[in-house]
Amino acid sequence: MASSSPDAPCSCDCFVSVPPASAIPAVIFAKNSDRPRDEVQEVVFIPAGTHVPGSRLQCTYIEVEQVGKTHAVILSRPSWLWGAEMGANELGVCIGNEAVWTKEPVGQGEALLGMDLLRLALERSSTAQEAVHVIAGLLDRYGQGGSCREDPEPFCYHNTFLLADRTEAWVLETAGSLWAAQRIQGGARNISNQLSIGTDISAEHPELRSHAKAQGWWTGQGLFDFAEVFSLTQQPVRMEAAKARFRAGCEMLQRHQGNITAEVMMGILRDKESGICMDSGGFRTTASMVSVLPQDPTKPCVHFLTATPDPSRSVFKPFIFEVGVSQSPQVLSPTFGAQDPVRILPRFQTRVDRRHSLYRGHQAALGLMEDEQEQAQQLRKKQQRLEQEGLEALRGLLTGEQTPPAQGLGSLFQAFVEREEQAYA
């Protein structure tokens, strides 16, 4: 039987800043992906594609109908699955997802994972609003379900999403195939493993309210509060931690209101006291991402990804969709084809080593940082200098002080990955 208990350790935090909350004329997106401690997250570049009409697409567990054209995407994903925890496409759409439990039962059947929905939306959408509708359509047609971890004991949940583009952001929260969405055209917003959309609903499933009435969750009188109606009546202890992280995230965003930058978002993702930078028992922050999406369409979007666990001891490296962009082999996990435990039924009966090259180097460095204080300080300084170079490159691009050739921008992420790996050698 699939486990759907909210008491199981699982947490994520997503943030977005839309002008005037941002210090610059840009939307800024950020996410910490909190996953099983030993799970490896890889960074994968998928080029744009043209596909045969009517062809089928294999996702993590099920096939869906492919569309004619797909956008190029950069994904940070658990290396055993098809979808992604967070990512962006070439048009500047960013999405992060989170686990959520509601009054709607979590199905045990295999369908689309929330992470599959995320990737499909990035590949098929040109705006955040379009991505909301893509996910809603896929939910209606295929549903969501299946184990979300690489373990013989299934672990299932529904999903919430934070979606952003160059002009605005959306929060999309689901309960089975039902959903509600909220548009954010200014200010800062965060989500943390709980329903957070109240009465301010910008779009919703056509049967959302009638279903709530039929279940006896809403009388039909007064304002319809999505979070109040669909949240579990008796909140488990685990959800109290999510509430605390949500409040802490709100407070940090409010503290920096009008002055939010990529550096501010990175600082929030590194905050251990709040639990946003997670390291608890069998779970931890396994990868992080911050994206800067300028409102000026002539300026490139810059996506910073760690590809390694614990952002407080990792490097945010800049990725830009430009000429010459390709897959960085150092952050790509090995593949196992038909022998992969996710492909053999029953699934996940064995374990394989999915660590990529940068993960191995970083893992060794973390061990050193815990044992040797002096060397740890030297290594952390190297990480900070490298990250600062990436942030300075971002500032130069946004101000127009730097106009490097497109080929150079396309290979920027690869160059930073190589330098980080050298620092760990």
From Swiss-Prot:
One of its GO terms (biological process) is proteolysis. The active site is at C12. It comes from the Eukaryota. Pfam families: Peptidase_C69. InterPro entries: Peptidase_C69. GO terms for molecular function: cysteine-type exopeptidase activity; dipeptidase activity. Belongs to the peptidase C69 family. Secernin subfamily. This is Secernin-2. The lineage of its organism: Eukaryota, Metazoa, Chordata, Craniata, Vertebrata.
